[in-house]
Swiss-Prot record:
Secretion signal, residue range per the UniProt entry: none
Complex formation: Interacts with the Sec translocase complex via SecD. Specifically interacts with transmembrane segments of nascent integral membrane proteins during membrane integration.
Family per record: Belongs to the OXA1/ALB3/YidC family. Type 1 subfamily.
Name of the gene encoding the protein in the UniProt record: yidC
GO biological process terms, semicolon-separated: protein insertion into membrane; protein transport
Coiled coil: none
Protein name: Membrane protein insertase YidC
NCBIfam families: PRK01318.1-3 (NF002352), yidC_nterm (TIGR03593), yidC_oxa1_cterm (TIGR03592)
Amino acid sequence: MDIKRTVLWVIFFMSAVMLFDNWQRDHGRPSMFFPSATPTRTVGSAAPGTTTPGTQPADLPATNAAAPGNAPAATQSQLIKFNTDVYSGEIDTRGGTLSKLSLVKQGDGKQPDLVITLFDRTANHTYLARTGLLGGDFPNHNDIYTPLPNQPHDLTGDEKSFQISFESPVKGGVKVIKTYTFTRGSYVIGVDTKIQNVGTTPVSPSVYMELVRDDQPVETPRFSHTFIGPAVYTDQHHFQKMTFGDIDKNKQDYATSADNGWIAMVQHYFASAWIPQQGAKRDIYVEKIDPALYRVGVKEPVPTIAPGQTVDVSARLFAGPEEERMLEGIAPGLELVKDYGWVTIIAKPLFWLLEKIHSYVGNWGWSIVLLTLLIKAVFFPLSAASYKSMARMKAITPRMQALRERFKGDPQKMNSALMELYKTEKVNPFGGCLPVVIQIPVFISLYWVLLSSVEMRGAPWILWIHDLSQQDPFFILPVLMAVSMFLQTKLNPTPPDPVQAKMMMFMPIAFSVMFFFFPAGLVLYYVVNNVLSIAQQYYITRMMGQAKTKAA
């Protein structure tokens, strides 16, 4: 029993250490275990789209090195601002590029509005959605587009949608009219590329649609490493994600061509994705284009356009929160950007159940409490077996200590005597281990559900907890966590080794300090789980004591 408890504590402690190490690396600090050189970012050395030599396919255009605001007056671009009920953003006339996009979650009066900037182009951060033409000297994201006159830039009144269109200069006998369609309440932007052949010879361009960003995380929670990087989905190969480290090492693995699916950039809570027309053949590319910039995109060939003819290429651009039900309705497989890792098969049903509970109680905090209670009820038989084993071990602990003292000079005889004691009392020292091990994947899955669900962002619980995705502002839950862990150690058998006993007493303090920085929703889950475990253990131990008294 002592060995089992020690092993479980060691596993728990090592997991916590690894989470802390991931947090270190997420925040640009050296790993405690795998130190490595960090590439230096040099502001102004390369603009978005400029590639490291040898990394860019010959047919993809490079970006003009002049950053916005530094270009010559003749080629100075403008920023066209727009607003909807869910977006606030800017479109750069250089390329008609969506260069800034802030997501706005309206408050309910009690809670303030929540705003996060997803797309942006500054000296410290780059994240863009851009398009253009390939296959000749055609308009691309480097050219200055002209916004069409008399266009609305805001969603007002009862309007359901509005459009903003941009016209390119004529290049290679081709003119492009790019139109963005914004819809009320929607995180999907329609992007229409109208290609007009105004020349005298046929042309056969390709349209590229790409997402470009640096490797800087946004709103990453402490003590956790959530995925950030590009992803590709096709019906044939399903969901394929790549870390920026994979791309650095040229180890990215993904489908390079398809006629379905989408490409995306994924980060904690939020994602963006280009969703081309299904059935249209396209090539897919993922690459590093600068010491700290990466891109994922598609190239879609266009049928030959005769002089005077026009071809439309339509696509959808998703940019928003990773809300599973919404994502399922946008495109097949898009809900997979909410990444649970290896516990997906358990985590998805748990989140579904959490959603169902929330649909009745209307509060994510109470939903966590009720889901934890439900899980503990399901696992009660297994927990009971574990606690009964612990109770039996606690009952014979004085006799075990006496045997250890008696045979402390002869380990072989001591082990033989202990085995005989276990046999006589019908106690298995590892009897409580299997029930605990079976439950571990479920509790790990619930951890990732709470960590990955954007629904927790800005969600209040009670009184002082106004955001379950942020740490407890007054550290009340971490203190309750420490108290509950301390009570659990008191209910368990006292280790015979004084050093081990002191370590067990120190553990609640160590973990409570770490949990001070965990999201409140996670700490709430652990507190409720511990309280229920204490109640179960106390009840079972008391019942066994009463049964023993009656038998006597």
